[in-house]
């Protein structure tokens, strides 16, 4: 029987891609793997462990937090705080970034941004959710506390990014700038194994993912693009199929494997869209580009946007290159 490579082996094997690396990034990816396992275990038994429902408080964006948003955040923060690979962390569920200034963190090279639980509206109804992470090398001097500047870096500075998808199976997908690979969790063994190597968007896609309930609020260009995808044109395989789960990770994963486009545009009610640039758009954009796809805000490359605030939002269009460029044409 063919033996699959474990995530741990793959991380070590690929450490050579980073001639300057001293193993910190590998150790950090392993910490994220560990936290992911713990969150996965909690999600699998959520209905029994009284961790469904609301936490009774709001995050900095005024969204009412789900108990699992809070728990997943605590698991990632405590796992990464207990291991010395990062000097700071920012999260969707925390108003401000955390500075890890204990001795073992002071000289750490990296910072992490996370969306601990993506697709929160789906938790209580057992639909696929995820965790998204983005890793940067610090800008501030080693030995000093992490600064806001360390977090407000453009997406092109990411050294690694990825997500965990908690679906029919649990898969960890990530890139370090050398392609995108996916590892499926085998609960029987308790390890992640390489199951999707060097993932690339298929040449063509015919699935579009957008919350059409917001159609009336969309800019004209997006309205026209949606009309275009729904028109009959057998040659161009239109109308496209509509698939929207309410979880960015799930829609992105499907579109990357089968071809498609995800759109969360700006609108009258959300002038800058809904998704957060630093821990949703940038990591997915890095993965998309590494898989041969594209990610824009309708006209500009997401990864070239200069962030101004920790929780700022950005219009997000991401998927097959050709499909994103068509949407951009309509936006022009
Ligand atoms: O319900 P809406 O407005 O369509 O938004 C759904 C989108 O918002 C998100 O749930 C935002 O992420 P969080 O759940 O992490 O807040 C995305 O996963 C999803 O694609
Ligand atoms: Mg999210
Ligand atoms: Mg979230």
UniProtKB/Swiss-Prot annotation:
A Gene Ontology molecular function term of the record: magnesium ion binding
Keyword Ion transport listed: no
Residues annotated for Mg(2+) 2 binding in this entry: 115, 118, 280
Pathways involved: Carbohydrate biosynthesis; gluconeogenesis
Residues that bind substrate: 118-121, 211, 244, 262-264, 274
Residues given in the record as Mg(2+) 1 binding sites: 92, 115, 117
Protein's cellular compartments: Cytoplasm
Record GO biological process: fructose 1,6-bisphosphate metabolic process; fructose 6-phosphate metabolic process; fructose metabolic process; gluconeogenesis; sucrose biosynthetic process
EC number of this enzyme: 3.1.3.11
Predominant place of localization: cytoplasm
CDD domains in alphabetical order: FBPase
Comment on bound cofactor: Binds 2 magnesium ions per subunit.
Keywords assigned by UniProt, alphabetized: Carbohydrate metabolism, Cytoplasm, Hydrolase, Magnesium, Metal-binding
Keyword DNA-binding on entry: no
Cofactor(s), names only, from the UniProt record: Mg(2+)
Family under the similarity heading: Belongs to the FBPase class 1 family.
Subunit structure: Homotetramer.
Entry protein name: Fructose-1,6-bisphosphatase class 1 1
Lineage start: Bacteria, Pseudomonadati, Bacteroidota, Flavobacteriia, Flavobacteriales
């Amino acid at each position: 029987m063919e033996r699959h490579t474990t995530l741990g082996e793959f991380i070590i094997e690929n450490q050579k891609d980073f001639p300057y690396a001293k193993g910190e990034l590998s150790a950090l990816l392993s910490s994220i793997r560990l936290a992911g396992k713990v969150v996965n275990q909690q999600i699998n038994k959520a209905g029994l462990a009284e961790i469904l429902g609301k936490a009774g408080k709001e995050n900095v964006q005024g969204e009412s937090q789900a108990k699992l948003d809070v728990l997943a955040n605590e698991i990632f923060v405590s796992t990464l705080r207990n291991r010395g690979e990062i000097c700071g962390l920012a999260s969707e569920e925390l108003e401000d970034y955390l500075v890890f200034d204990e001795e073992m963190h002071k000289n750490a090279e990296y910072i992490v941004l996370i969306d601990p639980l993506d697709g929160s509206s789906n938790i209580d109804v057992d639909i696929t959710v995820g965790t998204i992470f983005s890793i940067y090398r610090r800008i501030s001097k080693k030995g000093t506390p992490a600064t806001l500047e360390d977090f407000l870096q453009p997406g092109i500075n990411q050294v690694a990014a990825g997500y965990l998808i908690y679906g029919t199976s649990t898969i960890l997908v990530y890139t370090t700038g050398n392609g995108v690979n996916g590892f499926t969790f085998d609960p029987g063994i308790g390890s992640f194994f390489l199951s999707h190597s060097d993932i690339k968007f298929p040449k063509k896609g015919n699935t579009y993912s957008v919350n059409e309930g917001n159609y009336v609020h969309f800019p004209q260009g997006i309205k026209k693009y949606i009309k275009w995808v729904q028109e009959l044109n057998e040659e161009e395989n239109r109308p496209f199929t509509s698939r929207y789960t309410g979880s960015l990770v799930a829609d992105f994963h499907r579109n990357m494997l089968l071809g498609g486009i995800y759109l969360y545009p700006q609108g009258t009610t959300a002038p800058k869209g809904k998704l957060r640039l630093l821990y949703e758009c940038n990591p997915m954009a890095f993965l998309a580009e590494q898989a041969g796809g594209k990610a824009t805000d309708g006209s500009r490359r997401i990864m070239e946007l200069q962030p101004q605030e920790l929780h700022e939002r950005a219009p997000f269009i991401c998927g097959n290159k050709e499909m994103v460029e068509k949407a951009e044409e309509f936006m022009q």
